[in-house]
């Protein structure tokens, strides 16, 4: 009986490995994979406790090396030299996240917030119960989350300044040890709707499995975020693959995990709430377990930039041209790092 189960498991793993290999071939040739092959990567990650993803990360460093060396640069978050960027990348490798000491200027945050207040967002993130686009009302939200459309985000000059900041492409490249591309930008409101966790709004513990094998998300608070207004919560160290304590949780598949199970597996002392004033910036390897804490009162406005290795970031089938009002700083950054903006061609 035991031998039979082992043979069955080996057969399942072999099938998933074939699907994952097919996904990699598709990614190398066209920048995306079909859904079935992509799911094979995800299930293989869960069944191998991250070993398959770790192997793919090593391969990507060979297949897609960094296209340019790091150089010193100026950022809204300060001046960075090469060693400073590498030190931050190393801290992310250790802890899974990093909170920058400096903040985005209030003027930039306020400009984005003003645009977001007058822009319709998509409430709810529930594909089974879609809601019409609506303006977010912080006093009476109809859903726990309102997503601003990505094309509209690129129209906001303040957000363009954030995208143009070289810290994001440089730090992600240093962290990956490989080429880094901008996958997407996001902007959403989170509102208080009773303080109950909403799984569609990512308010229960989970790991991301976005454009494997490695990605890095940058979050910017555009409003003051306190423990009561929905801070990001991360499990320190949970991003490191092949951990024995993660094996049982990952074996459940791509599901939401209770606070109690996370605390038992990783220790309550490693559950970190990231509160901060407007303009706070932090980087997170979201293959680690994380969630957005449901706001108990007030609201949260959050920006997100996601960088990834280019294996599964399509630039042909899902392009989004830069807007006609692209700021000179954004155009200059795109010219300096053309590979990073492959999905975002210049409008003609």
PLM region descriptions:
Residues 202-209, 289-292:
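Histidine-centered catalytic micro-motifs
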Residues 184, 194, 198-201, 228-235, ...:
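A short secondary-structure junction signal
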Residues 2-30, 240-348:
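Conserved double-stranded beta-helix
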Residues 187-195, 210, 223-227, 238-241:
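Short acidic/polar capping segments at secondary-structure boundaries
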Residues 166-170, 216, 277:
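A structural signal for well-ordered alpha-helical segments within the folded catalytic domains
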Residues 7-14, 27, 41-94, 101-203:
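Non-heme Fe(II)-dependent double-stranded beta-helix
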Residues 217, 232, 300-302:
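Structural motif
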Residues 208-227, 275-276, 283, 306-309:
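Short, conserved beta-strand element in jelly-roll/cupin
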